[in-house]
Amino acid sequence: MTAEEVCIYTRIAGDKVGATRMDRPEDIEPSPKTGKVYAALTNNKYRGKASPDNSGKTQDNKAAKKTDGAGRPYEDATEVAPITENKNGLVLEMEDDHAGTKGKWNLLLVCGDPNEAYTYFGGFDKESVSPISCPDNVAFDEYGNLWVSTDGNALDSNDGLFAVAVEGERRGETKCFLTVPVAAETCGPQIFSNRVMVNVQHPGEIETDQGHPVGDNPDPTTNPTSHWPDGGKEQPRPAVVQVVRTDGKKIGV
């Protein structure tokens, strides 16, 4: 492949050199405190399921080697995605010489309902965490806490922004900071000592496969799922939200 082809067909180039296949990586960010790198892997509903066209070309699975009873190829659970039909996503943690030829990683979060056995929250007590699904963007505050915004929540709840401790005895503790309107996506968080800024994308969007109440009219311009931010009967609009702490205390402590 030429250098130009590598830039355009990056996933194919990665397969050729044996890169680790992941479940829809959406964002990546290094910790300003430790240098560890964190990646949000949103989900992969095809993992462990036969490909719709029997070709094996489902998501990150171009040449599946396993088949189901009907001979259809599928992508099985792997070490990097230890569950089949990964609906809720993962947060990957990498720590190594990033200029080296080899690296090491582990999973900080295996997202989903804490009551489910497959979920993992960095070793923290699962009875004391906020459920999180479909991590999309990641950011850090000045104290080294990871903040995760979500997109496409598969737990029948709205998307939101979550703070996650990555070091110390509270490692893996996940706290919901805010949620966005139904069918909207939380993205692009920016964390400061006294305020948090976040984007609210496509509020009012109709997603019938997720069971949102669309009635008999699937047109989001006439029957949106919300009227945020103006309310009433106004058209929903994307917006940037700023949450400000007014008591003088800092966010993330």
Describe the residue ranges of each PLM region.
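Sequence/structural signature of beta-propeller domains
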Residues: 1-253
